[in-house]
Amino acid sequence: MLDFMDYIQLAFAEGTQRNCDNSYSSLTATTQNLLDFTTPERVRIHLSSLSTPNFATSYTLGTVGLIEGSISYLYSNISFDNTPSKSALIPLRKLAPGYRQVQAPIAPPSSKGQKATLLHATLHLPPPTTLNALFLRRISPTMQLSLAVSSTRGPPLSKSAPQATLLTQLTHDTGKYSNEYLFSTDNSLFGWRGLWNFGPDPRFNNNAQRLSLLSAGAEAYYSPVSSLIGMSTGLRFCTLPAATSSTPNPNTPISTFPYTLTLTLTPLTGSLSTSYSVRASPNLSFSSRFGFNVYSWESEMVAGFELWRQSRKAAIVDNDGLEWARNKARIWDIPASSQVPEPITPSEEETQESVLKVRVDQSWNVRLLWEGRVKELLVSAGVGLGPSSFSPSSYANSQATAGAQGSSGGPPTSYWRGVGVSVSYSS
């Protein structure tokens, strides 16, 4: 589940009309949401608030072996008046990302007077204290600058300066294609990411209704200090919202199953990965991924799904035993046409949503995650089961160890890998 600050940053991207799907880093976003989700560790509590339309605060307290926490502040010159900030009103599907419906490429927004800016800082406690800071600025309708700083304080007796790393990212998005240029002070790393969308250019042909989208992208990294070279390329084919039902009600059946196909290749390491994700119904999605290495002949298979559950709570009517007197009084005071109360429509009822995510790999490592709303609290609970490693050999070794311990009378191997609960409240 996204924390409150990530949710506000998502609202900032929507407010500046930035298409997050038009980026190479989002090429496999759907698969990552359905298969690479993380479960909470131990117990963690989040308290957040949107104090003003431009300023937000967040406090986190957790117990992961020891008590630790963080303090976060965020400021933006873009107002968040229309952004739900109360935990009881925030749409759960925005906080629990699942199947990601890719939107059609759009033309850059028209230039406005004020340039959107966002400042975000997080201080992690206790020592070693770590400070993370983020600066975002929309330079132009097609350009965005991002500066991320991470500084860690050394040991208490150390007199050396705190270690700090600066990551600079410049994004150029035209709708038809996007380029990202990166530089990190860690080993003087230079990077580039690019994505190209096949089809008409939305800047010149924005009225064309497209049913599918084919995108190709690549990334490359180089460090002159450590002589590090990295490279990858990928393809994505997905259906667009125009291919499905145009009804605004998300509970109605869809005419065409939205699906996403991806293919990624890392030539230097010989890794090849393919994935297929489908939204079988408005509340059910499946995903699978197969990875193969041509050098080591190792393979990986992962499958998972997410299931959304919706429940409605009807309005509670108080019965104090005097309804007969009110009905008799209405006969004399109220016309007969208004005696029958209007029925409560489904939109007036309170709707509660929750989601269950399950993933399993070829080594029978299982993760289960439940996320939902309890009263005005957002709760995320998860558990991990299976061998600690994700390689097929670890599963065989664990089976052999379990058999040896069983024959010698020792305790059986535990497949319990951890459980955690995260509770969030925002106002």
Swiss-Prot record:
Subunit (UniProt): Component of the ER-mitochondria encounter structure (ERMES) or MDM complex, composed of mmm1, mdm10, mdm12 and mdm34. Associates with the mitochondrial outer membrane sorting assembly machinery SAM(core) complex.
Keywords: Membrane, Mitochondrion, Mitochondrion outer membrane, Transmembrane, Transmembrane beta strand
Domain description: Lacks alpha-helical transmembrane segments, suggesting that it resides in the membrane via beta-sheet conformations similar to those predicted for other outer membrane proteins and porin.
Function statement: Component of the ERMES/MDM complex, which serves as a molecular tether to connect the endoplasmic reticulum and mitochondria. Components of this complex are involved in the control of mitochondrial shape and protein biogenesis and may function in phospholipid exchange. mdm10 is involved in the late assembly steps of the general translocase of the mitochondrial outer membrane (TOM complex). Functions in the tom40-specific route of the assembly of outer membrane beta-barrel proteins, including the association of tom40 with the receptor tom22 and small TOM proteins.
Coiled-coil segments on the chain, per record: none
Keyword Mitochondrion listed: yes
Family: Belongs to the MDM10 family.
Compartments (UniProt record): Mitochondrion outer membrane
Topology relative to the membrane: Multi-pass membrane protein
InterPro entries listed in its UniProt record: Mdm10
Gene Ontology cellular component list: ERMES complex; SAM complex
Organism of origin: Emericella nidulans (strain FGSC A4 / ATCC 38163 / CBS 112.46 / NRRL 194 / M139) (Aspergillus nidulans)
Renumbered residue ranges of the record's region Disordered: 393-427
Subcellular location, principal: mitochondrion
Chain's gene name: mdmB
Pfam families associated with the record: MDM10
Low complexity composition bias: residue spans: 393-414
Protein name: Mitochondrial distribution and morphology protein 10
GO biological process: establishment of mitochondrion localization; mitochondrial genome maintenance; mitochondrial outer membrane translocase complex assembly; mitochondrion-endoplasmic reticulum membrane tethering; phospholipid transport; protein insertion into mitochondrial outer membrane
